[in-house]
Amino acid sequence: MKAEIISVGTEILLGDIVNTNSQFLAKELASLGIEVYHQSTVGDNKQRLLECFDESLKRSDFVITTGGLGPTGDDMTKETAAEYFGQKLELHKPSLEVLESFFVKTGKKMAENNMKQVYFPKDAIVLKNNNGTAPGAILKKDGKFIIVLPGPPREMKAMFNESVKPYLQQFTNEMLVSKTLRLYGIGESNLELEILDIINEQTNPTVALYAKELEVTIRITAKAENEREAFKLIKPVEEKIKSRVGKYVYTEGDISISEGETALEDAVSKLLVEKNLTIAVAESCTGGLVSSSLINYPGISSVFLEGCVTYSNDSKMKRLGVKRETLEEFGAVSEQTAIEMAEGVAKGLKANIGISTTGVAGPGGGTKEKPVGLVYTAIYINGKTIVKKNIFNGDRRKIRLRATRDLLNELRIQLEKL
């Protein structure tokens, strides 16, 4: 079965808001074994939406729309879908009762234009909205159908899960199941070279790579009658991949991550909590980014003792006990200073682990010997200190971000050895 997703709204078309609805729907439809080959975004324009319906239903069995179900004049998705199928709208009394009850409970007066939200084609399946005023609907004709859902993600997701998903399950006898591996420390090109034969030889399951900022995701997807059978197909492929690049895998599972974000910090924080190892952080060039990454994880307060930003030499000496001679001989950006920072913050707080960053984030301040992008990171753990030197490319933001993630990944590796 084939479906298409149409996002309706000029605000999406202009980039004023991020369209997360399509991502959610694509994943949900895939899990039902429904194929999605096209997604479209249309502004608040009836003629263009009619054209989009026509093109989509030539290629697919049904269309799901989000947005355009509000009370204003430019909310026209339902009306346009009805026009496309040649169906007239009429008052849906159960929806009117729900709408009137909503306004009574909230103590607000219902505007006249809210009435347009309770008109539907006679044979439409009306979908109750438990989180807003705009019901959805399923409009059908000649074996094709259009599902119209509200635009606000909270309303759309609830309506899909409560009403649409059960409706669609009658049309599917297979399901798609995916297993996700998230990797750090290897680029997409090198990863592809490592597992290219696995990618090429697979039909079910399939293997796909997705590059994000500073990390790569491997998605293994199988089609089967049920989840158990799908995972049976996935397991040998997953094991084969891990035998080659397993050292780069920092977490697995279908975790939804926004562009530019990562689950790496959660993986590290989880290890710290599970192993009950306390940690203290001393930062210079990253300016608190390491600490803020770790404390996003629920329960981290049981092991995270302190994070300090020691930007100046004076603060490095006073707060961390970095020797004046070290700073004078080697400089603030040096292996020796990074080591003393990590050891100083750990010993001062009696933490099991101390980590540190010091570097030149730019755009100025670099020299031939110490260029912009030079960063030293150190980890004090089990009485030993591991120090790394990196020269990162990019602007100030990216250098700080890469330094943070590289340090967290190295910490993950050390924790997994314990």
Curated annotation (Swiss-Prot):
Coiled coil: none annotated. Pfam families: CinA, CinA_KH, MoCF_biosynth. It comes from the Bacteria. InterPro entries: CinA (IPR050101), CinA-like_C (IPR036653), CinA_C (IPR008136), CinA_KH (IPR041424), Competence-induced_CinA (IPR008135), MoaB/Mog-like_dom_sf (IPR036425), MoaB/Mog_dom (IPR001453). Transmembrane segments: none annotated. Belongs to the CinA family. This is Putative competence-damage inducible protein. It comes from Clostridioides difficile (strain 630) (Peptoclostridium difficile). The gene is cinA.
